Amino acid sequence: MAQSSAQLLFDESGQPFIVMREQENQKRITGVEAVKSHILAARAVANTLRTSLGPRGLDKMLVSPDGDVTITNDGATIMEKMDVQHHVAKLMVELSKSQDHEIGDGTTGVVVLAGALLEEAEKLIDRGIHPIKIADGFDLACKKALETLDSISDKFPVENRERLVETAQTSLGSKIVNRSLRQFAEIAVDAVLSVADIESKDVNFEMIKMEGKVGGRLEDTILVKGIVIDKTMSHPQMPKELKNAKVAILTCPFEPPKPKTKHKLDITSTEDFKALRDYERETFETMIRQVKESGATLAICQWGFDDEANHLLQANDLPAVRWVGGPEIELLAIATNARIVPRFSELSKEKLGTAGLVREITFGAAKDRMLSIEQCPNNKAVTIFVRGGNKMIIDEAKRALHDALCVIRNLVRDSRIVYGGGSAELAAAIQVAKEADRIDGIEQYAFRAFADALESIPMALAENSGLAPIDALSDLKAKQIETGKSSLGIDAVFAGTNDMKEQKVIETLLSKREQISLATQVVRMILKIDDVRVPDDERMGY
């Protein structure tokens, strides 16, 4: 007889009722065992990222099931590409994504900090302290750390371009582009300042387009004050350069109208076929005439058109670009002050945009070509055009630039800064440890554990730089306490000074606050889980 897979209880009248079904088909772990399992999974993920922290951090190579290779040291990208099975490890992936979505930078640091907090929490659990007490203590310690960050922060002059470039260089220092650090930092700053509204402290990232083309060197990367699209003129004999162009942006196809309903066309003679061909030709000519009469000197079409239409456009001296995607159409309309026209009959002079220069740019021996629309009336649309030896380098350069753009955007939003090299975390750790001495309850243990976890950031920076981590950290801590200078950090690039203010290693207060807050919240969530039930037939890391 098959054993029942449900848990049964009986009421006072002896009637059975089911409490939980499929008990035997579930795997269950509870209590301290569950918490420790989760801590182990989260720490495993954090340790993977630990070696990628800082300017001397190492890259990771990630190969997808399809064979696509990604080489990166961007925390969010590593986490996204990792095939994580354990559900708590997936929380760490989401943590990195949250930091990337909200701030854009600090995605590696936030995961490393969360892993260190969980490591310290495990030690406290082994000493018999309840996980909720630990979580409550971490929350209070987090509040104290954030207060310390606020007190040591400096006001940043956003109008000073040179200081902005220095901040972007800090973000780019650990990336593949660090050999062209200054150039990429200037590109990032100029791109953000081009689209930023300083008064409302707003930066519209949709106005910054990133394009890449394999070939050339990273140093060939440029910022174009306009739009670059991966298209060419539709006919090889059309002009490769237009000055003071009047641009018509069309979302209607260059073809005869088609019936909306199902239809059948009977062609029984050559005369019928000629009549059909003549009708198509007349339709094309009417459409071209309408565009020409509006005063347009360049037609940009969302849809394609056949060779006959292309020939007629060339014959009528009307340059055209076909198959331009929706996002590019919108950017072009904003940049040129054009209206997007859905029907030829609606096209008029008022709906045209203007561009001072439209030109095809060529690359390499193969003469790859792209179209550049520059000198537009609305200069709040720019394109960062990235070059590199292969697609992997270009993709990683784009990710690096994205982080730098986010850092500059955050400074426009909130101009307060702290100094890097682990100096801010160490200053916060010193103050949290001091606060622990003033607390009577069990939370004091959590405060000290939180301080130790904060020290994991400068320690990881020292490890990745080839320094003796414990010696470097103890010396640095003693100097900070002795001098009271919160800008003393790990000299990861061997510049000869520990003062990050002198080295111009700058990080945004917004990013640091978010890292500590998010890491503490996720750790609290993990510590509060004490019972896990998973289907026994699924492999989920348990």
UniProtKB/Swiss-Prot annotation:
| Main location class | cytoplasm
> What InterPro entries does this protein's entry cite?
Chap_CCT_epsi, Chaperone_TCP-1, Chaperonin_TCP-1_CS, Cpn60/GroEL/TCP-1, GroEL-like_apical_dom_sf, GROEL-like_equatorial_sf, TCP-1-like_intermed_sf, TCP-1_chaperonin
> What are the protein's GO molecular function terms?
ATP binding; ATP hydrolysis activity; ATP-dependent protein folding chaperone; unfolded protein binding
Transmembrane stretches in the record are none
**PANTHER family (UniProt xref):** CHAPERONIN
Quaternary structure and partners: Heterooligomeric complex of about 850 to 900 kDa that forms two stacked rings, 12 to 16 nm in diameter.
Q: What is this protein called?
A: T-complex protein 1 subunit epsilon
What organism is listed for this UniProt entry? Caenorhabditis elegans
Upper taxonomic lineage: Eukaryota, Metazoa, Ecdysozoa, Nematoda, Chromadorea
